[in-house]
């Protein structure tokens, strides 16, 4: 069970809605993933249409919507998008994204912290997408963010946990949930993040661009479940030296 702010989730896998070939395929993949929290870019939704091709099937699926401010380049733009999302969707939950460079889509730490502080004061449940910077994550936690979402690698890159060393520090020091976001390319990346102690992962591109998104979503669901179980089982310590699983001492003594 995962708790963030006022909500609890059985699944530790969050999903996105971009890059799917159709809204039907998107919903089928989300259902196969078991995800209960789904991100939604406000720039992709036509709020004037109650039957929007993306929004309507998500509402019907009964998932918790997490609108995001993707496309915002400044704190001011992100705050405006957040207010629009709250008014249109009736939710105070928000994934805060501010990335001024469209080529790399790396989050702006200064603008993100500025916006997060303002949005928390306005009553939002803020989940900020941020770099894997332990100091920044602690500052975001201190201004009241409900969770932190450090990247594993650039958005959509499928590179995996390139920031593993920093993620380990963030996980160790955080008192709010840590959701590894961006760069996760295959189910084993997700399992590794959960084994490390992350509370959840957010996956979009890896599922949406697979030849079979529904099958890939199922694979991610199973990988996340395995990662959670592995962490709960408490793995043995790593050792520099070999440690025989079947010592032969007694057997050899019997032959003497």
From Swiss-Prot:
The active site is at residue 95. It is found in: Cytoplasm. One of its GO terms (cellular component) is cytoplasm. Pfam families: ThiG. InterPro entries: Aldolase_TIM, Thiazole_synthase_ThiG, ThiG. Its main location: cytoplasm. One of its GO terms (molecular function) is thiazole synthase activity. 1-deoxy-D-xylulose 5-phosphate binds at residues 156, 182-183, 204-205. Keywords: Cytoplasm, Schiff base, Thiamine biosynthesis, Transferase. Belongs to the ThiG family. Homotetramer. Forms heterodimers with either ThiH or ThiS. HAMAP family: ThiG. Catalyzes the rearrangement of 1-deoxy-D-xylulose 5-phosphate (DXP) to produce the thiazole phosphate moiety of thiamine. Sulfur is provided by the thiocarboxylate moiety of the carrier protein ThiS. In vitro, sulfur can be provided by H(2)S. This is Thiazole synthase. It comes from Salmonella typhimurium (strain LT2 / SGSC1412 / ATCC 700720). The gene is thiG.
């Amino acid at each position: 069970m995962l708790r963030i702010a006022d909500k609890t989730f059985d699944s530790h896998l969050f999903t996105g809605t971009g890059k799917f070939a159709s809204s039907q395929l998107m919903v089928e993949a989300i259902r196969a993933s078991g995800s209960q929290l789904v991100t939604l870019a406000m720039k992709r939704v036509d709020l004037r249409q109650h039957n929007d091709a993306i929004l309507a099937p998500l509402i019907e699926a009964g998932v918790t919507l997490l609108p995001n401010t993707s496309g915002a380049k400044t704190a001011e733009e992100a705050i405006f998008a957040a207010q629009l999302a709250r008014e249109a969707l009736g939710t105070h939950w928000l994934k805060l994204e501010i990335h001024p460079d469209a080529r790399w889509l790396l989050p702006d730490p200064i603008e993100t912290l500025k916006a997060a502080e303002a949005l928390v004061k306005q009553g939002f449940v803020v989940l900020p997408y941020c770099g894997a910077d332990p100091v920044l994550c602690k500052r975001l936690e201190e201004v009241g963010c409900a969770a932190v979402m450090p990247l594993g690698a650039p958005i959509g890159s499928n590179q995996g946990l390139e920031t593993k060393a920093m993620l380990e520090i963030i996980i160790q020091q955080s008192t709010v949930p840590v959701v590894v976001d961006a760069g996760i390319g295959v189910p084993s990346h997700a399992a590794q993040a959960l084994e490390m102690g992350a509370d959840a992962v957010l996956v979009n591109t890896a599922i949406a661009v697979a030849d079979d998104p529904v099958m890939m979503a199922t694979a991610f669901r199973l990988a996340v479940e395995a990662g959670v179980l592995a962490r709960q089982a408490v793995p043995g310590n790593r050792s520099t030296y070999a440690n025989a699983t079947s010592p032969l001492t007694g057997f050899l003594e019997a032959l003497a």
